[in-house]
């Protein structure tokens, strides 16, 4: 009996998994896979940094460059503090959206301190990449913004906001709404 090209296991059928009918499975995957990985790496608390993706180290005259270095330094100090806390059984990790600019600066500060840092990137039509300072085991790429924001805030014990654009404002207002409605504290 010849194996049919239609006889695929549903979970191995890429065409199905990318279809509208499988959207719920993709959403569930973006909940369960990060949960499993964060549990494996014992990440129970994060310090979430947000801010402009446009802040560049090379652009000395840009007003955002100052914030890049401030985010990097603050993240460095918080990561050093988190390393001391880890010895007491608490595992704080720096968390960002995983992209360039302020996100890179925060991941870079944690990397410089030899601490763990997490990046939660989003799949976009234009070039979007994970910055090189993220701990590889804590690198995530999401398809859905709402799942990305869920994980950015779910383990957050502190939120640090730097100047940014619409994405930063969206994340700030989402956080404030969740605090105001007692969904997070």
State each model region's role.
Residues 3, 8, 14-120, 128:
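Glycine-rich beta-alpha loop segments
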Residues 125-185:
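Conserved phosphate- and dinucleotide-binding cores of soluble alpha/beta proteins
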